Structures are given as structure tokens and as C-alpha cells.
């Protein structure tokens, strides 16, 4: 199956050529020009007389992205921003919350230190007060820090379900190994890592959490008093090998056989303050979990609603073509630019240059979709040819190959340069343009100005390739709205219809007059 496209009718339409010229001119006007260029403008554009070779590779339904309506309102955008902020906050909490084992076997959960909720070091040290005080004082401290623990608990709840079984196992091995040789000396406070990467070291008189309180959440039923004899004859090596652990904890094999690590959710390591107020916190935690569940449910419903909306927007005549486009034609672009020589003073010499860009080579895979009375065009990827290693091409992304130099009389000069964009080491996803030729027309020139012309040409070619890649390479596309033309045609048809009705009305009136005149004549 083949299609015949009247390329001549397409290229002779001045409206299409002017629209493309205006588009390129606006893009070039938005560029930040270097110091040796000024007054850049596109003066002419023609599609040329040579049509491209187009091969249809696939026919199917349009991409879902084409159905997304950017004019739905600001509500969706605000929701997206809130989701991004929420994910960013969770990522920061994930980086800030760490479980740090100390040498005595106790652990402390690092506080979430943000720029807006932490104060002096003295305030942070309040969590590590001496346990030589009465238990009531510790309880008061726990109530004082109740709000902060609640915030840490909420932020770390999201992180715990992301920990893997390997992390849990390694953390427990470190705890057991450190517990095998307990020290009665004053332990050092584990380092606190601030968001700025600063490490501070503080000392403690005594760890607040016993080793038993850490192991209990993991389902370990052994307690410290059951294995005092085994602790004397056991070392860290025997623990790693799976023998009886210190303090009667049991072997690693026994611990892993309890199926405590089958879930990806690591149990919560409770502090003393949390244990005291655990009953009070349970109801609040349940409420927070329900709120998070409702939030995820709401997001899921929004996604389903978006899919349903896209399904409603689809029509039976929507179609998309995946095409292979191979173009080696005589399309051309005319540009005017002023070349500046900034030595010995800024703008010392200004020389207008006319650049004639032609002979584009494009071999790519593109998609053309028709839906909602609009045509969407986007380039997906390049197609490698056997002749991609053009002669004169090197590892540079844009390699000039001078095919001609001065032309015309002695008072005028110019050069013709072929630029190739074939680079095996190119990291870009798509180039679109593989080859392009530039013909420059300048006035009286010197060799140093000719070298600057080469810089101008290279700059313009790189910018042209960047414009095409950013504007019409996937995930970007251009849209040709056909609904406006249909509305104009309908308006024209309505006007013609009204004029016909008015003409018929006049004809009826004229007919009546003629009849009356005819009757008068008979009388």
C-alpha cells in the first residue's frame, strides 16, 4: 500500500513556509548570542522541490501523552508540585534518619535535623542526659521530647518499609558482635551527622537503652540473665559462626529460623520515652496510618480518573503512524547576522553576513498522530546509515569540511562549508540533522574575519540542531491545529448559505413585482 503526496502543492503554499520561518526566527531571537554576533534574524525559508522518502513502519493508536490537555487548569499542576514536595521531604528524612549502634550494644535514632527545627547543641544534648537522675526526671524529659519523637516516628515510618532483609541481618550481626564484649567504661556518644555533612562527637555517661529492649521487637525470647555462663566462653568469632551468642541471646541460626526477616518492614526500635507513652501513641499512629492510606488511595483514584478522562477523549478515527523519514533535499534557510570585531575596542568593526543554509540530510524515525482535529509530529530517534562515517568527519559533534572558498570578484568573498553531525561517541539521544551545508556571502574580508565567520557558522549550526532537538524531538512535539481551519470553512459556508438565501428572497420579491406589473398591463 502506498500514498501519493502532492509535494509541489505543499511547498508552494506560502503560509506553510512563512509559519516555519516565523517559528525559527522566534527561536533564534531567544538565544543568548556571543560577543562577536549581533542582529541575528531569519529572512527566508523554503521547503524545496525534492520530497523526502517516507516508509510507514507501524499504524496504531496515538500515544497517551498526546491526550494530555495542558489547559485543564492549575489544579493538576499544584497537585503535582505537592507530590514532588512530599517525595522530596521523604527523601530528606530517609537520608537523615539512621540507626547507629554504639559500642555498648545500645542504639540511638539520629534526630531529624532540619534548618527550621533544630537549635543549639545544648538543646540536642538534652536527649542524652545522665541516667543518674531519678526515673521521674527521665519520664519528664520523655514527655518534654514527646512532640519531637512523634515527628521522628512519623518521618521514619515511611523509611522502615524500604529497608531490605540484608540490611536488617547486617545490623543485627553488628549488634550481636558488639554485645559479645561489653565494656563497663563510659561509652562514647555515636557521631551525629548534620544535613551539612558536619560530624560532631559527644560523650555519654551511660546508654539509655538496654540491649534487651533492642532485641525484644525482633522476637528474641532470650534475656540477659539466661546465658551468663555462656557469655564467658563465647567470643565475637563464635557468634559470627553461628554458635551460642553472648548474654544468652542464642545463635544466629536460631534468630533467622524464627522467620523474623520474611517481611521487608523492619520493626520499630522503641526508646524509653516511647515505651512509657506507647499506649497513648497507639491511637494517634493508627490515625496517621489511616490518613496516609487515604492519601495514597486518593492519588490512585486521581490516576484512574486521568486514565478514564483520556479514554473519553479518544475517538474512533484517532490514528498514529510510525514513519521512517529519509530526506536529502534542497530545503534552505537564509539568515542575516552582523559579525563584530571587538579589537582594539568593542564593536570596532561590524560586518553584515548572509548565510544560506541548505542540503540537509535527515534519516530518522518519527511519529505523526491525528486526534482531536489536530496533527502531532515528533521525532523519536535517528537511523544509522552505512555512510554515516562521512569523509572528513572526526570525533567532533559538528565537523566542518570546506568544499569551496572565495567566489565572485576580488571585492567580494565567501565560502561553502559542509557540517557533519555524525559522531560515534555522541552521548545525545537524537541529532535529527546529520549533514548541512552553509554558503556565506560577505563583503571585503580579511583572513582573520574569515576565521570568525567559521565560528559564526559553527555556533548557528549547533543552535539550529539544539532547537530542533528541544522542540520536536520526543518527548516534545509540534501540533498543527486543524480545528481553526474547519471553523473558518464552516463560517464561510454559513456566510455563503446566508447570501444564497438573501438572493433567493430578492428573487421572490422581484418575481412578485413582475407578476403584478404583468396583471396591470392586462387590465
UniProtKB/Swiss-Prot annotation:
Residue stretches of biased makeup (Basic and acidic residues): 108-117, 289-313, 502-523
A Gene Ontology biological process term: phospholipid transport
Subcellular location: Mitochondrion outer membrane; Endoplasmic reticulum membrane
Domain SMP-LTD, chain residue ranges per copy: 1-483
Region described as Disordered: 108-160, 178-213, 270-313, 483-523
Keyword annotations of the record: Endoplasmic reticulum, Lipid transport, Lipid-binding, Membrane, Mitochondrion, Mitochondrion outer membrane, Transport
Family designation: Belongs to the MDM12 family.
Function: Component of the ERMES/MDM complex, which serves as a molecular tether to connect the endoplasmic reticulum (ER) and mitochondria. Components of this complex are involved in the control of mitochondrial shape and protein biogenesis, and function in nonvesicular lipid trafficking between the ER and mitochondria. MDM12 is required for the interaction of the ER-resident membrane protein MMM1 and the outer mitochondrial membrane-resident beta-barrel protein MDM10.
Subunit composition and interactions: Component of the ER-mitochondria encounter structure (ERMES) or MDM complex, composed of MMM1, MDM10, MDM12 and MDM34. A MMM1 homodimer associates with one molecule of MDM12 on each side in a pairwise head-to-tail manner, and the SMP-LTD domains of MMM1 and MDM12 generate a continuous hydrophobic tunnel for phospholipid trafficking.
Identification of the protein by name: Mitochondrial distribution and morphology protein 12
Organism: Lodderomyces elongisporus (strain ATCC 11503 / CBS 2605 / JCM 1781 / NBRC 1676 / NRRL YB-4239)
Taxonomy of the source species: Eukaryota, Fungi, Dikarya, Ascomycota, Saccharomycotina
Amino acid at each position: 500500500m502506498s500514498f501519493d503526496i502532492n509535494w509541489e502543492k505543499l511547498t508552494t503554499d506560502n503560509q506553510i513556509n512563512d509559519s516555519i520561518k516565523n517559528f525559527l526566527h522566534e527561536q533564534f531571537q531567544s538565544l543568548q548570542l556571543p560577543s562577536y554576533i549581533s542582529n541575528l534574524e531569519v529572512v527566508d525559508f523554503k521547503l524545496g522541490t525534492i520530497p523526502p522518502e517516507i516508509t510507514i513502519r507501524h499504524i496504531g493508536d496515538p500515544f497517551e501523552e498526546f491526550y494530555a490537555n495542558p489547559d485543564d487548569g492549575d489544579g493538576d499542576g499544584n497537585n503535582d508540585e505537592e507530590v514532588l514536595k512530599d517525595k522530596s521531604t521523604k527523601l530528606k528524612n530517609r537520608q537523615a534518619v539512621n540507626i547507629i549502634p554504639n559500642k555498648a550494644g545500645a542504639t540511638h535514632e539520629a534526630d531529624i535535623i532540619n534548618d527550621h527545627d533544630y537549635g543549639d547543641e545544648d538543646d540536642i544534648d538534652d536527649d542524652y542526659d545522665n541516667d543518674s537522675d531519678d526515673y521521674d526526671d527521665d519520664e519528664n524529659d520523655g514527655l518534654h521530647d514527646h512532640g519531637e519523637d512523634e515527628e521522628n516516628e512519623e518521618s521514619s515510618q515511611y523509611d522502615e518499609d524500604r529497608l531490605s532483609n540484608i540490611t536488617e541481618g547486617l545490623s543485627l550481626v553488628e549488634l550481636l558482635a558488639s554485645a559479645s564484649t561489653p565494656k563497663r567504661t563510659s561509652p562514647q556518644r555515636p557521631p551525629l551527622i548534620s544535613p551539612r555533612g558536619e560530624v560532631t562527637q559527644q560523650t555519654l555517661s551511660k546508654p539509655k537503652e538496654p540491649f534487651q529492649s533492642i532485641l525484644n521487637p525482633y522476637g528474641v525470647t532470650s534475656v540477659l540473665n539466661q546465658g551468663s555462663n555462656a557469655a564467658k566462653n563465647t567470643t565475637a568469632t563464635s557468634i559470627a559462626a553461628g554458635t551460642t551468642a553472648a548474654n544468652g541471646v542464642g545463635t544466629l541460626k536460631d534468630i533467622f529460623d524464627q522467620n523474623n526477616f520474611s517481611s521487608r518492614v523492619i520493626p520499630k526500635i522503641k526508646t524509653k520515652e516511647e515505651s512509657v507513652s506507647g499506649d497513648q501513641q497507639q491511637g494517634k499512629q493508627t490515625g496517621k496510618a489511616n490518613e496516609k492510606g487515604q492519601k495514597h488511595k486518593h492519588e490512585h483514584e486521581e490516576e484512574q480518573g486521568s486514565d478514564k478522562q483520556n479514554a473519553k477523549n479518544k475517538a474512533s478515527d484517532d490514528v498514529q503512524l510510525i514513519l521512517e523519514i529519509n530526506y536529502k533535499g534542497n530545503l534552505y534557510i537564509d539568515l542575516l547576522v552582523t559579525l563584530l570585531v571587538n579589537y582594539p575596542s568593542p564593536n570596532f568593526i561590524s560586518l553584515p553576513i548572509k548565510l544560506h543554509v541548505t542540503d540537509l540530510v535527515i534519516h530518522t524515525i518519527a511519529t505523526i498522530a491525528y486526534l482531536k482535529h489536530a496533527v502531532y509530529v515528533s521525532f523519536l530517534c535517528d537511523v544509522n546509515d552505512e555512510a554515516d562515517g562521512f569523509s572528513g568527519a572526526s570525533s567532533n559533534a559538528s565537523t566542518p569540511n570546506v568544499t569551496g572558498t572565495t567566489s565572485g570578484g576580488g571585492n567580494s568573498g565567501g565560502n561553502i562549508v559542509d557540517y557533519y553531525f555524525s559522531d560515534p561517541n555522541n552521548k545525545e539521544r537524537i541529532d535529527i540533522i546529520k549533514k548541512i551545508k552553509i554558503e556565506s556571502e560577505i563583503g571585503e574580508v580579511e583572513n582573520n574575519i574569515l576565521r570568525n565567520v567559521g565560528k559564526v557558522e559553527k555556533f548557528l549550526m549547533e543552535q539550529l540542531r539544539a532547537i530542533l532537538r528541544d522542540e520536536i524531538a520526543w518527548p516534545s512535539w509540534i501540533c498543527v491545529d486543524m480545528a481553526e481551519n474547519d471553523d473558518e470553512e464552516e463560517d464561510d459556508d454559513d456566510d455563503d448559505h446566508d447570501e444564497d438565501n438573501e438572493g433567493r428572497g430578492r428573487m421572490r420579491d422581484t418575481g412578485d413585482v413582475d407578476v403584478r406589473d404583468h396583471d396591470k398591463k392586462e387590465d
